[in-house]
Amino acid sequence: MLIVKRTSEVKGIINAPPSKSYTHRAVISASLANGLSILKNPLNGADCLSSAHACRMLGAEITNEVEKWTIIGSKLKVPDNIIDIGNSGTTLRIITGISSQIPDGYAVITGDDSIRKRPMQPLLDALKQLGIESFSTRNNGIAPIIVKAGKITSNSVKIRGDMSSQFITSLMMTLPFSETDSEIILTTPLKSEPYLNITIDVLDKFGVKIEKIVEENKTGYKIKGKQSYRPCEYTIEGDYSSASYLIATGVLLNSDIEVKNVFKNSKQGDREIIEIVKKMGADVEINENNVKIKGPYNLKGIEIDVTNIPDLVPTIAVLGCFAEGKTVVYNGEHVRLKECDRLNACAVELSKMGADIEEKPDGLIITGTHKLTGSKLKTHDDHRLVMAFTIAGMLADGETVIEGEESVKISFPDFVDKMKSIGCNIEVI
């Protein structure tokens, strides 16, 4: 667990960790490309290593080093054992689709307790539309999942756009194997679109083209058939989701910090954290590849639509605790479908510290109190809650004890060390 105490000042230069979203998609794309690919600056986090493990099970040769991964991709093979993807929902969803293209037999995909609670039925239903047989072993729409090898026999699939963009990413990465051109048709308005923009961006670098469909009565994506993934050398950019904790720390504390490896023109939706803190009153400096912050700033509450930025909700919740007036988070129903119900967890745990938070069906209303008190907090082994609650603890009176700190290895393995390097008063016990 983490012991967090009030921190008076933070100062220094800190690199944002590599992007989890980009690393997942790049290692899987490289594994599907026939030949040698090099991934520079990959995220050596547990979730991305789960994707690398799954790709090995499906035939890729992967060497993981700290600063680069070497991948020799080849044709998919039948896995010789169950594919255990640990705690990685992204891996589960993408590999479920991809594994349908093994030459014969079956693939079985499962993970830890948390993964075996994550919804999969919308993806299984979509694969069925394409002629692919896949099912939950317990007939309850969650892992373990069994996928049968099979050709794609339909050129159109309909799926909701408001549950998980990972389902759509899985289809995007699988449909290039089809013999014919295909369409993904969205039956509801799309949420988390920036994650699909990341998918399209990565696939483009590996030679796979996807077009967006925007018509009066149809929204979705068009994927040409018989496409081949091509090997390449690819550099992973920094992760704005993880950088949000560094940025919020600088905004709320007496600070002089520079966050490097975050790009002004990134396709990541979570780059919105810059605009959010600016609208709240923080005069941060954004450059081509870094953000400079000299806090603290006097913040004011604002209304924030989190349709496309679900991973920022825990960070926003903490910022709202120290803003004047009300901070309203809305359009966040899908935030309940992450590693845990993050809306409920933020409301319950921050309230223990004295925060004034009202939970709504699609979001939160946070009334700034400017004062929190240390408490013992549960995180449901959710990495984003651990990091957000750490910020709250540094601004609270007394001592804050945060359970489940091991989960940060998923997206920000050296979170504690980097935070301590700029002066944060935190310890692992």
From Swiss-Prot:
<comment type="subunit">
    <text>Monomer.</text>
</comment>
<keyword id="KW-0057">Aromatic amino acid biosynthesis</keyword>
<feature type="binding site">
    <location>
        <position position="192"/>
    </location>
    <ligand>
        <name>3-phosphoshikimate</name>
    </ligand>
</feature>
<feature type="binding site">
    <location>
        <position position="311"/>
    </location>
    <ligand>
        <name>3-phosphoshikimate</name>
    </ligand>
</feature>
<feature type="binding site">
    <location>
        <position position="166"/>
    </location>
    <ligand>
        <name>phosphoenolpyruvate</name>
    </ligand>
</feature>
<feature type="binding site">
    <location>
        <position position="166"/>
    </location>
    <ligand>
        <name>3-phosphoshikimate</name>
    </ligand>
</feature>
<comment type="similarity">
    <text>Belongs to the EPSP synthase family.</text>
</comment>
<dbReference type="InterPro" id="IPR036968">
    <property type="entry name" value="Enolpyruvate_Tfrase_sf"/>
</dbReference>
<comment type="pathway">
    <text>Metabolic intermediate biosynthesis; chorismate biosynthesis.</text>
</comment>
<dbReference type="GO" id="GO:0008652">
    <property type="term" value="P:amino acid biosynthetic process"/>
</dbReference>
<keyword id="KW-0028">Amino-acid biosynthesis</keyword>
<feature type="binding site">
    <location>
        <position position="165"/>
    </location>
    <ligand>
        <name>3-phosphoshikimate</name>
    </ligand>
</feature>
<dbReference type="GO" id="GO:0003866">
    <property type="term" value="F:3-phosphoshikimate 1-carboxyvinyltransferase activity"/>
</dbReference>
<dbReference type="GO" id="GO:0009423">
    <property type="term" value="P:chorismate biosynthetic process"/>
</dbReference>
<dbReference type="GO" id="GO:0009073">
    <property type="term" value="P:aromatic amino acid family biosynthetic process"/>
</dbReference>
<dbReference type="InterPro" id="IPR001986">
    <property type="entry name" value="Enolpyruvate_Tfrase_dom"/>
</dbReference>
<feature type="binding site">
    <location>
        <position position="118"/>
    </location>
    <ligand>
        <name>phosphoenolpyruvate</name>
    </ligand>
</feature>
<dbReference type="Pfam" id="PF00275">
    <property type="entry name" value="EPSP_synthase"/>
</dbReference>
<keyword id="KW-0963">Cytoplasm</keyword>
<feature type="binding site">
    <location>
        <position position="338"/>
    </location>
    <ligand>
        <name>3-phosphoshikimate</name>
    </ligand>
</feature>
<comment type="function">
    <text>Catalyzes the transfer of the enolpyruvyl moiety of phosphoenolpyruvate (PEP) to the 5-hydroxyl of shikimate-3-phosphate (S3P) to produce enolpyruvyl shikimate-3-phosphate and inorganic phosphate.</text>
</comment>
<feature type="binding site">
    <location>
        <position position="342"/>
    </location>
    <ligand>
        <name>phosphoenolpyruvate</name>
    </ligand>
</feature>
<dbReference type="InterPro" id="IPR006264">
    <property type="entry name" value="EPSP_synthase"/>
</dbReference>
<dbReference type="InterPro" id="IPR023193">
    <property type="entry name" value="EPSP_synthase_CS"/>
</dbReference>
<feature type="active site" description="Proton acceptor">
    <location>
        <position position="311"/>
    </location>
</feature>
<dbReference type="InterPro" id="IPR013792">
    <property type="entry name" value="RNA3'P_cycl/enolpyr_Trfase_a/b"/>
</dbReference>
<feature type="binding site">
    <location>
        <position position="25"/>
    </location>
    <ligand>
        <name>3-phosphoshikimate</name>
    </ligand>
</feature>
<feature type="binding site">
    <location>
        <position position="89"/>
    </location>
    <ligand>
        <name>phosphoenolpyruvate</name>
    </ligand>
</feature>
<protein>
    <recommendedName>
        <fullName>3-phosphoshikimate 1-carboxyvinyltransferase</fullName>
        <ecNumber>2.5.1.19</ecNumber>
    </recommendedName>
</protein>
<feature type="binding site">
    <location>
        <position position="21"/>
    </location>
    <ligand>
        <name>3-phosphoshikimate</name>
    </ligand>
</feature>
<feature type="binding site">
    <location>
        <position position="20"/>
    </location>
    <ligand>
        <name>3-phosphoshikimate</name>
    </ligand>
</feature>
<keyword id="KW-0808">Transferase</keyword>
<dbReference type="GO" id="GO:0005737">
    <property type="term" value="C:cytoplasm"/>
</dbReference>
<feature type="binding site">
    <location>
        <position position="384"/>
    </location>
    <ligand>
        <name>phosphoenolpyruvate</name>
    </ligand>
</feature>
<feature type="binding site">
    <location>
        <position position="20"/>
    </location>
    <ligand>
        <name>phosphoenolpyruvate</name>
    </ligand>
</feature>
<feature type="binding site">
    <location>
        <position position="164"/>
    </location>
    <ligand>
        <name>3-phosphoshikimate</name>
    </ligand>
</feature>
